[in-house]
Amino acid sequence: DQLADYAQIFDEQTEYDQQQIDKIIEVFDQYRILTAIHHGNLGLKALNEQVEAALLEHLPDFQKQGDWYIGRPVMMTYNDYQLGLSNGDIGLCFKHRTQLNECEVYFPSLKKWIAAARLPKNIQTAFALTIHKSQGSEFDYVYIVIPKRDSHLLSMELLYTAITRAQKKVTI
């Protein structure tokens, strides 16, 4: 169970060095759930909530602090010049290095730490991404969630984009 393995990484660590952080990010970047839609039970929000709930079951000792918890991946959905973050930047939430009971987010593409409290409230959880937002990214394993009903958003081109995000395996 990939989710249990992911949770265990965070459960076992109390402090992180850069090598451990890089390993955690490598594990996180192996898998991604992609969807064409934002709303509904197969939409982005619902999929992220389902993964989040399952993950928190594997981290019984950790309490959510509002929307924040150790292991939460987040994606910026717009540019924030004050923070130096761009639309599409993805970070991972870790225990704060100096503040007890606080979280901070590491953005690996920028090699930058930002306290979770400084990030915008509408930052998006990123276990699942829209196919559109995944363009330019690659993952070892991709799970593509397709709506049961016809969706004007789903085209052969979009499906091709989703499939080509996978390096090793695609599950539809």
Residues covered by each model-derived region:
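Core RecA-like ATPase module of SF1/SF2 helicases and allied nucleic-acid translocases
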Residues: L3-I172
